[in-house]
Amino acid sequence: YNIPEDITELKALAVPRDGEFMEAFRKTAQRLGIAVAVTYLESFEPLPRNTVTLFDSTGRRVLDYSKVHTCDFGDECRLSAGEEFSTAELDTASGKVTIGTMICYDREFPESARILMLKGAEIILVPNACPMEINRISQLRARAYENMVGIATVNYPYGKPDCNGHSTAFDGIAYRVDGSGSRNTLIIEAGEREGIYLADFPIDDMREYRRREVHGNAYRRPEKYGLLISEERMEPFIRPDRRK
């Protein structure tokens, strides 16, 4: 994670989607027979983008997403923002699963996970690079709960600048099927150290839960939410460094 102040240096660090760097990961996914999500500084004009690409277990590229909510108050003011949120079907051992992605600061906005849910996402992948503490982890739990989606977050480990590990996965199933009460949606929370952590999403149970519970898109009233798409901002939310 490195965004130099010098634009020439920044562009020199960026790599294309179809270049040698990404080809190495594509071949690795194909060789190991696993899906791989890769984050990278993508070559783009006028400025590079913070991008994640998902390869399936055959090495086929199935999803590209560039971070929509760039941190314009920090060093990401030197990056281009992405245009939209995307989903894709991924072949897994449990059959086809619809995957969406959002990157780090995107999770601060409920709209990010919401639009992915509306586009059919069942599991949302969240590459992350910041301290994961109770408030940010609670955000992810809430995104899973309110959209009835799985959320899998991968954070840089302790030792990287401003990072502390604590990657998490939530399945979004907040209530037991037998009506006996609520349950903890957390599948796993990693420690601070780098490692391989396995999260087993009960996809059939998640789908059944979505068919019967009241969250997600079941009872929304989008006709009442017109102000959500207004571009007007008023105090106290005016920020001079906010880009369009």
Q: How would you name each of these model-derived features?
A:
Residues 157-244:
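C-terminal beta-strand edge segments of enzyme domains
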Residues 40:
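Glycine-rich, histidine-containing beta strand-loop boundary motifs that form or position
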Residues 30, 57-60, 67, 204, ...:
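Generic secondary-structure signature for well-ordered alpha-helical cores
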